[in-house]
Regions:
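Membrane-interface extramembranous regions
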Residues: 1-145
Length: 145
């Protein structure tokens, strides 16, 4: 697959997985967590941020800051998931992959989002390096080495 097709594919796939994670959090908010102090609003905030960033990712080629924000929202969701199963978050704890199947689906979409964003960033970096003109040493210096 050439780079001209890869970048739009990565952009669309990243936006899709980010939006899917947001949808799962919105669904959990409506079904279960809206009455949980602090946690409920955080689920709603995560869902809103995911939807907004997913939409912005689809509008042209986003700058690095936007991709970093998408990664940050995703990392925040994963950190909250891990913390809620270990030390707890604001007194809230859960165990295992409950609620099922949303916990597992959320883990998969968020891990997929991070993977896609990482591949996208590596591809953009390689493309920028390839576009630079190589620095050549003057002929005099090459002859003496």
């Amino acid at each position: 697959m050439n780079i001209q097709r890869l970048l739009p594919t990565l952009r669309s796939a990243s936006a899709a997985t980010l939006a899917a994670g947001g949808y799962i959090h919105a669904q959990l908010y409506v079904d279960e967590y809206r009455f949980v102090h602090v946690i409920g609003p955080l689920f709603l905030l995560q869902a809103s941020a995911s939807f907004a960033l997913a939409a912005l990712l689809l509008v042209g080629t986003p700058p690095l800051l936007l991709r970093a924000a998408a990664a940050g929202v995703t990392l925040g969701a994963l950190a909250g998931f891990i913390a809620s199963r270990t030390v707890g978050v604001f007194g809230f704890t859960e165990h295992g992959l409950q609620p099922a199947p949303q916990a597992l689906l959320s883990l998969l979409t968020e891990t997929g989002t991070l993977l896609l964003l990482s591949i996208w960033q590596m591809t953009v970096t390689r493309q920028q390096r390839a576009a630079r003109t190589p620095v050549r040493t003057p002929l005099r210096e090459r002859a003496t080495h």
